[in-house]
């Protein structure tokens, strides 16, 4: 092994070794227990970010852990076409490079550009995954637009359609006028903005005599939608207005006569108590319109301008001539804000604008394009999720699918109990084109292809069929991911072996987008051999969101994004600044980002290697919703990897010529060897329990504690003493245990730190005569419930306490570690005497002792000894001969004066009534603790000084 640990020397070489030899591949052995994880397919829109790296590390830990338990493992890898996100990206790209828009290309030519991007992006993402150590079967890599996946998507659509679960309907949707597509409710961001509220008069048509008011006053924040009003609503309990129910008003500008209706949606205590109803452009109004069977008017074009003619529909969405469809010429083709100004101008001219008020209200914005969302009446395809939800609710309630942490179960159930039908169509070019064809009479035909439809329905070639232009929502194909990747609808061996999968690792932000829909679609479409619905996965492990060191969300615009590969390989400051400030959507932020980057990383980012990054992810994987990234912990775990490397070098150096033999734990072995085997066994138990319960943070801490604090800090120090002073038999057997424990420890650590453990294991296996080719196919250490001895643990713990006491004595009395001391023990029982006798040479070596003596109860204690009672035994370390009395007296007096000075300041503060009355409680508590600590130090120093003054011993005292 090289002297210095350099991840670059081992990582790429080892990954190629694993991949080339097919160690990641599953097999078709039905008799072997299977374990399968479906990787949530990252989008092809760019490189992997911290969230991807974090979740993929967790998944790889689980895959490697289960593979080492002898399971037939499949980690299915793939990427998502990400319809809307990818199309936006390519549209921006061609505008930036060519000053062209999507509409300057044919659909096929535009899609060719995306496929070209996909090839480049996929290569980059794949390279990143390999750098992270992902043990995926690359031969089974999938893309959501692969032909076999597309076939699965079509088959799913056809089955759902033929079972009346997919339907087409004109309904109100969230419309993105920039992208000209419907977007999901979950892609709408509500922002609080400053705006105005306009109070508009609607003249009343007086059909009866007892109407004594001229108009109804309505408050609106969207006066442009007045063009689409089809009613005014008042609350039936409102005494001011209920006599007007059934009457009519004139809608200003368009002079449309609309009814006054009674509906509880109108809030008597809000604004005027009367509301305008625009079913074609407001979701609440749409519901009111459905209750009262009101006509619906569409006033906007798909790109957000006023139409040339109104589109008028009845409440069921059928074309209607209920109202005049003409729009005044001066409003036609105006954008929304211009139309708003024009409407207000005209209403004011008509004397129908009563007042304007400033207000703040929430406005829906598209998370995709950033424009204000317009509720729009459009014809879309829907999936009846309300018909699929109950079984998906039941499996979670019955714990057939478990959410970890459990709090996300409530979130899931809450949403599922209020689920609405899912709009599955999108007005995009990139994606799965809906497998629906229309003839010239608008008859609908659903099938895999035009050819198959003609065959199935006996349609001649003379009849023209046109395929629906829309594509399916990306989440529809993603919802089939657990089984489409395994060959469904064909009954493949892989589907039989690996479905249902074992665990889904995902974020809380896509529980509704993806997880819920996967459960519903899988349970409806996939059945076991008995015809029972299959679940997509047994467990759902929800990770927290990785935030920066200040707790802020990582984003390009904030300039706080860190590429995981930059932490693995390192990056210079200039390269990091360039990376963070290039291609910003808001270039004016570049100076701020530059300043922040220089402040945070004045020397760039140092290379840490993959294992340190993976260990950091594991250590931070708590059950919290937000996870704050910590560069200092990353550096600390880089040092941890270095510690393991150096410890392994020591072991290999001292065992290179050792002839290893198998052994069992017995009472004849040295206490330290029995102790390390028991400690390791206990570590295995708690470590496995942590991984089995998805507590990766606890598992990482357990591993860290054993490697650093138990194996390196104590066991290796014990071993050095044995090698230096032990008998031939003790040395030989200790080397055997040493290499054995290291090999087991490497196996235990492998799932979290695959590269460094493989690199070291390849050398360890030679000494242990292991013929296998890789650590990743070794058996994972198992807990042995027979291997436990409380006395061994307590005896070594006692020895450790003695050593720590001696080291503290040296520190207190300023005694060099090269100066030999003596150790006296008093009030010691026979068991402890035996422990001392058998481990005397270890104690002497580690604690730098000249001699160890046992005193009887009658013996006087050595003068000027530091004493501590440890586990009932008096431990005494004489220091008279080890110190220079005059120098030590001077040092102690100086220290005492310093402490007295600090105590005086603290006491003065604590006697100040103003401080006690006005200082915050935490500051006062801190001062109390400080004074207590100073008193304790003063007492200790005073006792040491007194002991020094009493340095001349009485006649019967034992001298050092």
Curated annotation (Swiss-Prot):
Annotated residues for binding of ATP: 556
InterPro entries attached to this UniProt entry: aa-tRNA-synth_I_CS (IPR001412), aa-tRNA-synth_Ia (IPR002300), Anticodon_Ia_Val (IPR033705), M/V/L/I-tRNA-synth_anticd-bd (IPR013155), Rossmann-like_a/b/a_fold (IPR014729), tRNA-bd_arm (IPR010978), tRNAsynth_Ia_anticodon-bd (IPR009080), Val-tRNA_synth_C_sf (IPR037118)
Motif, 'KMSKS' region: chain positions: 553-557
Motif interval(s): 'HIGH' region: 42-52
Coiled-coil region: 879-950
Family membership: Belongs to the class-I aminoacyl-tRNA synthetase family. ValS type 1 subfamily.
Quaternary structure annotation from Swiss-Prot or TrEMBL: Monomer.
The protein's role, per its UniProt record: Catalyzes the attachment of valine to tRNA(Val). As ValRS can inadvertently accommodate and process structurally similar amino acids such as threonine, to avoid such errors, it has a 'posttransfer' editing activity that hydrolyzes mischarged Thr-tRNA(Val) in a tRNA-dependent manner.
Protein name as it appears in the record: Valine--tRNA ligase
Organism: Buchnera aphidicola subsp. Schizaphis graminum (strain Sg)
